[in-house]
A protein has these predicted regions:
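Hydrophobic anchor residue at the start of the ABC signature
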Residues: 150, 178, 466, 485
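Coupling and communication elements adjacent to P-loop NTPase active sites across diverse families
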Residues: 1-11, 89-146, 229-347
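Catalytic Walker B motif of ABC-type/P-loop ATPase nucleotide-binding domains
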Residues: 161-165, 170, 406, 478-483, ...
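ABC ATPase nucleotide-binding domain signature region
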Residues: 30-31, 43-104, 364-376, 380-432, ...
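Conserved catalytic segment of ABC-fold P-loop ATPases
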Residues: 200-207, 519-527
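Conserved beta-strand
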Residues: 5-8, 17-29, 57, 340-346, ...
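Conserved catalytic motifs of ABC-family nucleotide-binding domains
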Residues: 157
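ABC-family P-loop ATPase nucleotide-binding domains
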Residues: 74-139, 411-478, 483
Length: 540
């Protein structure tokens, strides 16, 4: 029940190195693996699972490995039994019941006489009770497919279980069933996730940071506390190093000025004393050499202080929080920005909402969380609110002003435009200086503002999109967000939270991320389920 990676290196076919000489081990228990997007978390899981070959080094897993990737390799025509890997055993059991007692049948069955009962128990545990084993995947929701994939891995009883973002497509109920299932897993569990509720159920956190794996005992909250404390120390060290550098520079300048004054006075004294030129020259050389030695001492002190500052700055993480002021997004408390009554719509021949429709009114700077099971119609309702989809029945009224949408795909910006060009297109009346200042608030500085959108990392794309949405002309009075944290790393989630907390308009957010919803000050909870839209007191 362990994973041992020794001197592991991996490079892509174009020779771009992802990590080098990585060594670590993970034993029994639950380990959460965290890192910024692009650091190589998913690739590391694929290396451990044997799907990728390392450029150098070795991976040794003690026991059978179960692996649930982020993108599941299932086709729509597969049956539930095929995904669970039990179809051959079920066929053999059926053949035995029909009188076939061949060695091949008994070999196929092996010890799995109770495979159907165990399979159904595992499916029931993950909320898939009543799911027929011959049902095709094409008829299941994305969340059901993920839960089925996890059931398949747990059914194998692996010694090592690798999960890559297992909660991404799960609604709240399915997430909690997954949490419970993993709580009872007794092998070596390694999970890549940005789900902070799941990470808080881990025994330890492994962080892939600057090409190394660093382990932190305890759950994600304990890890965050440790990192925050270290960052506070690093910030203090930077301040001290900056002050020391200023002191050393000042002292060097003062020493140079004193030496210059002494040299000037000495020259005057030598002239007044009428000393021979050879004596006067020696005195001058001695004074210059003494000044040079003193200057070298001060220069070394300045270099040492600069080195200490560089070291202190390297210890500071680039996990900066966005700090914004968004006065133009203010919506008066009494202003109704959207009203919908008797809304009804059908998708795929199925009515999403109750026969009498649903109603929704958004007033003032409300912060609304829209929850409910997958497939209930939450994303469809957002599209009705922003006008990209018209209801089949019912009435809609939108106040004058702009409604902006932010999807989990972050596909709002033109791929060939630079960050600076994107903001200029969104806010053409802003001066160049003002745009540069705003982009700096979103952590875009120097050459980064001239990068095309297509070349941005996931976190950079989020920040660029937020800048263009929040500072667009006119500023949005209503913001719609559909599972905005799904493809973000933990740093980017924190930056999104900061931006939304600065936003002063109304927003409606669809999310199953409980910690995210807690952090953005939701003041109204709505649940869409079985065609009914109802007020609730919390995420459940």
């Amino acid at each position: 029940m362990s994973i041992v990676c020794s001197h592991l290196s991996f490079s892509w076919p174009d020779d771009v190195e992802l990590f080098a000489d990585l060594s670590f081990s993970v034993g029994a228990g639950r380990t959460g693996l965290v890192a910024p997007n692009g650091a190589g978390k998913s690739t590391l899981l694929k290396l451990i699972a044997g799907e990728y070959r390392p450029t150098a080094g070795t991976v040794v897993a003690d026991g059978a490995i179960g692996y649930l990737p982020q993108s599941l390799p299932f086709t729509a025509d597969l049956t539930v039994a095929a995904v669970l890997g039990i179809a051959p055993v079920l066929d053999a059991l059926a053949a035995l019941a029909d009188g076939d007692a061949s060695d091949e049948v008994f070999t196929t069955i092996g010890e799995d006489w109770d495979i159907e009962e165990r399979s159904r128990a595992q499916l029931d545990r993950l909320g898939l009770d009543g799911l027929a084993l011959d049902r095709r995947l094409g008829t299941l929701s994305g969340g059901e497919v993920v839960s089925l994939g996890l059931a398949a891995q747990l059914l194998k009883r692996p010694s090592v279980l690798l999960l890559d973002e297992p909660t991404n497509n799960l609604d709240s109920d399915a997430r909690h069933r997954l949490y419970d299932a993993l709580d009872s897993y007794t092998g070596c569990l390694l999970v890549v996730s940005h789900d902070r509720v799941l990470l808080d159920r881990m025994d330890q956190i492994a962080e892939l940071y600057r090409g190394e794996i660093v382990f932190y005992g305890g759950n994600f909250t304990a890890y965050q506390d440790t990192v925050d404390a270290a960052q506070a120390v690093a910030e203090g060290n930077i301040r001290n190093a900056e002050q020391q550098l200023k002191r050393e520079k000042r002292q060097m300048q003062e020493a140079r000025e004193r030496a210059a004054r002494r040299s000037s006075n000495a020259a005057r004294n030598v002239k007044d004393a009428g000393l021979p030129k050879i004596v006067a020259g020696k005195l001058k050389r001695d004074a210059q050499e003494s000044a040079a030695r003193a200057d070298d001492v001060h220069a070394k002190r300045v270099d040492d202080a600069r080195t200490r500052l560089d070291e202190a700055e390297r210890a500071l993480r680039d996990d900066r929080v966005i700090a914004l002021d968004l006065p133009d997004t203010v919506v008066p408390a009494g202003r109704t920005v959207f009203t919908g009554e008797g809304l009804q719509i059908s998708r795929g021949g199925r009515k999403l909402f109750a026969d009498n429709g649903i109603g929704l009114s958004i007033r003032g700077p409300e912060r609304i969380a829209l929850t409910g099971p997958n497939g209930a119609g939450k994303s469809t309702l957002l599209r009705i609110i922003d006008g990209t989809l018209e209801p089949d029945a019912g009435t809609v009224q939108r106040a004058d002003g702009r409604i902006a949408s932010l999807s989990q795909r972050l596909d709002l910006l033109a791929e060939d435009r630079t960050v600076a060009e994107s903001l200029a297109a969104a806010a053409p009346s802003l001066s160049h200086t003002r745009r540069m200042h705003l982009l700096a608030q979103f952590l875009f500085r120097g050459d980064r503002i001239h990068l095309p959108v297509a070349a941005l990392s996931g976190g950079e794309r989020l920040r660029a999109t937020l800048a263009c949405v929040l500072y667009a002309e006119p500023a949005p009075q209503l913001l719609l967000l559909d599972e905005p944290t799904n493809n973000l790393d933990l740093v980017s989630v924190g930056q999104l939270e900061s931006a939304l907390n600065a936003y002063q308009g109304a927003f409606v957010v669809v999310s199953h991320d409980e910690r995210f919803l807690d952090a953005i000050g939701i003041d109204r909870w709505l649940r869409l389920d079985n065609g009914e839209l109802s007020a609730t007191s919390a995420a459940g």
